Amino acid sequence: MNIVVITGASSGMGREFAMQLDRGLHSVDEFWLIARRGSRLKEIASGMQHTVKILPLDLTNEADMTVLTESLEEEKPVVRMLINCAGYGMMGDFTAVPIKEQTGEVDLNCRALLEVTYGCLPYMRAKSRIIQLASSAAFLPQPGFSVYAATKSFVLSFSKALRAELKERQIYVTAVCPGPVKTEFFEVAEHYASTLAMKQYTMVEADRVVKDALRASSKNRPMSVCSLPIQAFWAMTRLLPQDPVICLVQKMREKGTEVIEEEKESE
C-alpha cells in the first residue's frame, strides 16, 4: 500500500497539501492525516477522493507519537510522500513570551519533526519524497521572533543534511521556505506581539506556496522559496553581513511598536 503522510493537516499549509495532492496524485492508495483536531481532519477527509486514515495525535506527546510508529509497523505501507507541516510560532521579545510556549515551539517544530521523519524513513523507497516546512525566517535570526526563526533554521539545516545522506537511496528532500502565508498561523503567533507591516504586505495565499513546493519537490530541488520579495530577501541574507540586517530588523520592530502605541493612545 502506497501512502502519503501529512502532519499539521487540519488547517493551513497541511490542509492545502492534502487538497492539492488528493486532486493531482493518483499513484497512492491512502492519505494519513495527522493533527490534534480530529473533527477538522474528518471534515477534510469527507471532501477527499482518496481513502483517508485519520490520526488525531498531539506529536509533542510521546504516547501519541507511539501510535504513529505502531501504525506504521502494523500496516507496513510504502511511504511515497512525507510532508511535515506541524508547527507554530510566537511573536514577541524572548522575555515577554512564557517559556512553556517557547519550549513548545522547539518540541513541535524540531523534535516532533525529527521523530516523524525517523519513523517514516524505514518505509520509504527510491523516488519517495520528503517535504519539510521551514520558513524564510530560517534565513536570518529575527528579533521578536527569535525562537521560531531558530527552529526553522534547524529544519532547513537538517533538511539539507538529510538530503545528502539519502541521495544514494534516491529519497528526495525539499525544504519549503515561504514568507508570511495567509493561514491561521498568525492568530496564534500574534498573541503577544503584532506582525510587522512589511510582513503583511508580503503575504501570499497557501495554495500558491503549496503549488510551488510540489513543483520543487517533483524536480528534486533542495528548496522552495515562493514569491519574488522572499527570493530577494533570501539573496540579501546571502550577500550582506548578518549583524547590520539584524539591527535593521530590530529598529523596524521598535518603530512599529511606537506607531502601535501612538494609535492606542489616540483611541
Where are these regions (language model features)?
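Conserved glycine-rich Rossmann-like NAD(P)H-binding loop of the short-chain dehydrogenase/reductase
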Residues: 26-43
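Substrate-binding pocket helix/loop in short-chain dehydrogenase/reductase
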Residues: 93-94, 98-103
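Residue(s) in the substrate-gating loop at a strand-loop-helix junction
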Residues: 135
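Conserved NAD(P)H cofactor-binding loop of Rossmann-fold oxidoreductase domains
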Residues: 85-90
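SDR active-site lid
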Residues: 168-228
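Active-site helix of classical SDR
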Residues: 117, 151
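Conserved glycine-rich cofactor-binding loop
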Residues: 10-11
